[in-house]
Amino acid sequence: MEFSWGSGQESQRLLLSFLLLAIWEAGNSQIHYSIPEEAKHGTFVGRIAQDLGLELTELVPRLFRVASKDRGDLLEVNLQNGILFVNSRIDREELCGRSAECSIHLEVIVDRPLQVFHVEVEVRDINDNPPRFPTTQKNLFIAESRPLDTWFPLEGASDADIGINAVLTYRLSPNDYFSLEKPSNDERVKGLGLVLRKSLDREETPEIILVLTVTDGGKPELTGSVQLLITVLDANDNAPVFDRSLYTVKLPENVPNGTLVVKVNASDLDEGVNGDIMYSFSTDISPNVKYKFHIDPVSGEIIVKGYIDFEECKSYEILIEGIDKGQLPLSGHCKVIVQVEDINDNVPELEFKSLSLPIRENSPVGTVIALISVSDRDTGVNGQVTCSLTSHVPFKLVSTFKNYYSLVLDSALDRETTADYKVVVTARDGGSPSLWATASVSVEVADVNDNAPVFAQPEYTVFVKENNPPGAHIFTVSAMDADAQENALVSYSLVERRVGERLLSSYVSVHAESGKVFALQPLDHEELELLRFQVSARDAGVPALGSNVTLQVFVLDENDNAPTLLEPEAGVSGGIVSRLVSRSVGAGHVVAKVRAVDADSGYNAWLSYELQSSEGNSRSLFRVGLYTGEISTTRILDEADSPRQRLLVLVKDHGDPAMIVTATVLVSLVENGPVPKAPSRVSTSVTHSEASLVDVNVYLIIAICAVSSLLVLTLLLYTALRCSTVPSESVCGPPKPVMVCSSAVGSWSYSQQRRQRVCSGEYPPKTDLMAFSPSLSDSRDREDQLQSAEDSSGKPRQPNPDWRYSASLRAGMHSSVHLEEAGILRAGPGGPDQQWPTVSSATPEPEAGEVSPPVGAGVNSNSWTFKYGPGNPKQSGPGELPDKFIIPGSPAIISIRQEPANNQIDKSDFITFGKKEETKKKKKKKKGNKTQEKKEKGNSTTDNSDQ
């Protein structure tokens, strides 16, 4: 069973195979259609469903479809009617090219059962493509030298159609030079071409244009054409020829590089390389031309490449050669002449020759300093040069001969004003615009010793304290010299002279280089109050010049002298005074008086007295006047008092530090002595006066301090206002000023006339300072002194109502002496410089013309008054010495009386002190005045010798 079953299956398989083979063979039957190319869309091809034996109703159920190996979109089947139609444009040449047969193969497939049918659609050719040449224009290049019958091949046309539509016929447009050679069936190797029938001449006919036409064999005929552009190639049979054989060009000098000079041009009848011309300079041209110019080988432009200078070369001759590029080059020649035009391009040139520098400042006008040469390389007016000089210089230009100028001195020189000049000479030509050049030279002015050293001031005032150390620097003088170098080197020296019995150089010295003035020895105010001398400054020029300056050295006082006790009685020495006093004397009785003087001045000579008890209660028994030195009793003596009293009186000055001397007074009390006739009223008044003296002194000190402060402030302001005043005449002149120092030391008078020299450097020592102290003579002598002072004018002097202070501490100064720097107090005549209060409690109101001295000035305020002459002092004229002046730091008043040269009569104010009494007026003759002056001079000489 199993084998039968197996046999049955194999039988079924065989039957199925035969069935499928039969269907395949039936489907492989082919249907053929034919259509022309370029058929329109929808063109009927065939009833494919009917031809395949298929019903129209079966097409859709059996999925009828058409497939193509080529382009399936060309043909399509309408499933409604079973017709095959053209779906898109069919181009046989595109589809099959130049193939002789062209068909479209379709496969028609149906399902249920599956059947495949082959359909072939033949595409027939139509004459739809004209013959075409590869290009519309064909360029042919034929040399004019080609021989006749030369064959030139041509490329034929092509036709996309086939068959008769592709059979082509050629024809050539008529011409004289070429004919068309057509290929035949037996000459296919040679092909289509042109044959030269006439010789070519490029210069006559450079170009030939022909038209080649082709026609196919279709109906209707289609044609195509190509334009043959035959260019006749040149043969080098013509030489280049220039437009002109000679070119003349004018070229300004100094044109920049690259400037076009001229453009030469040559022509060649040939063309191509045979007509291409290369320009160049001839081989025999000068190197200078090649250096200055350049020619473009293609354009023929000649340009400037070097500096063109008319002064170097006025014209250039250039030979130009033109050569073509033929195989056998031909050449042509021409000449270019370049004429250089002169322009004003050269600045004038200046040169200094024969310089004579430096020039001395004292050179005369007209001195030649330098020789200047000028030149200009230009010609004509461009080369005409004129020179000028800078303004405001003491020089001028003088034209000596052609192209030469002399620089000469036109005015006087002064090196101190201008030490050197920068002289600028300007040379300008006559061109338009003109050119100019400058040359400068520095003219140095050599110095000549024409200026003497000059001091800043004609006179200096110096204040030096006495007892200075030897070699002390007291001042520095400085002089300026406007000259230079050796002429400005200043050396200083003293103007030697004698000061009394000694030389000036023994007192001071001056450093030759620095001008420092040194004191060689300690100066003594008591010996020398004013040292006036001159310092000379001389330069190192030849000859040397010099000038002098005056120095006034005021020696300021220091407290270097202790008070000196006077010995009023003969045989008494050692400062011990013995007195006998009766026990019956009352209070206030003057027992003794201590007398002392101080060689110093001012406060240093202001003495005060103080009682120092040496035993027991002597202090309560006696007292001493603070400034008078009078020792008086303080009470009535009794029996209990010791019969011998030893009193120690301390005499002290007001210096800093103060110096003290001690005086011893031995008082012996005796019985039944004469009773002093001292009125009780006077004693009471004295007692009250002495008691109030201390209180008054306190206020006086306060007032002095206030006035001193105000005085210093006034002095500073006054100095600032008068600092610019130039003295008209020095203090030490030919007249003899007399300095009178007045002082009083109590109810006694001590007179010592001391004459001291004021040393001057300008004149011989003719000035004396007269120092007066209270006289030892009685009141009658003092009266005579007052009378001599009053009688000098011949009439009574009226009192000054504005003067109510001590004349011993008041001074006016109106002089040309410069004392401001040291703070010397100055004022006009009649104007007080310093005022001091007075104490007049113990005295009645003073009479007109009488004032009391200040408390503490060494004057007894109870008994001393001051008297003076009438009227205001005389106004000092220019060159006159002041009546009074005060040295700072010293309260003493120095009164200088200046006597006229022709009249030795003393007419200045004379100050003295005396007890309050009525003054007497007397007149003295001139002879008596002269006799008195001689006596005073003799006393002064004696005093100086004692010192």
UniProtKB/Swiss-Prot annotation:
Gene Ontology annotations for the cellular component aspect, listed alphabetically: endoplasmic reticulum; membrane; plasma membrane; synapse
Localization annotation: Cell membrane
TM regions (residue ranges): 698-718
Residue numbers on the Cytoplasmic membrane side: 719-947
Expression tissues: Detected in brain throughout embryonic development. Detected in adult brain, in particular in cerebellum and forebrain.
Position of the signal peptide: 1-29
Sites carrying sugar chains: 257, 265, 438, 440, 442, 548
Chain spans, region Disordered: 761-805, 824-853, 891-947
Region called 6 X 4 AA repeats of P-X-X-P, residue ranges: 734-891
PXXP repeat residue intervals: 734-737, 774-777, 796-799, 829-832, 870-873, 888-891
Region of interest called Required for interaction with FYN, as start-end residue ranges on this chain: 738-947
GO molecular function, one term: identical protein binding
InterPro entries, alphabetized: Cadherin-like_dom, Cadherin-like_sf, Cadherin_CBD, Cadherin_CS, Cadherin_N, Protocadherin/Cadherin-CA
Matching SUPFAM superfamilies: Cadherin-like (SSF49313)
Domain Cadherin stretches: 30-133, 134-242, 243-350, 351-455, 456-565, 573-681
Gene3D superfamilies: Cadherins
Keyword Cytoplasm belongs to the record: no
Membrane topology category: Single-pass type I membrane protein
Domain remark text: Cadherin 1 to cadherin 4 domains mediate homophilic trans-interaction, the interaction with an identical protocadherin expressed by a neighboring cell. This is a head-to-tail interaction, the cadherin 1 domain interacting with the cadherin 4 domain and the cadherin 2 domain interacting the cadherin 3 domain of the other protocadherin. The cadherin 6 domain mediates promiscuous interactions with protocadherins on the same cell membrane. Each cadherin domain binds three calcium ions.
Self-association state and partner proteins as the record states: Forms homodimers in trans (molecules expressed by two different cells). Forms promiscuous heterodimers in cis (at the plasma membrane of the same cell) with other protocadherins. Interacts with FYN.
PANTHER family in UniProt: CADHERIN-87A (PTHR24028), PROTOCADHERIN ALPHA-4 (PTHR24028:SF133)
Name assigned to this protein: Protocadherin alpha-4
Naturally occurring in which organism (per UniProt): Mus musculus (Mouse)
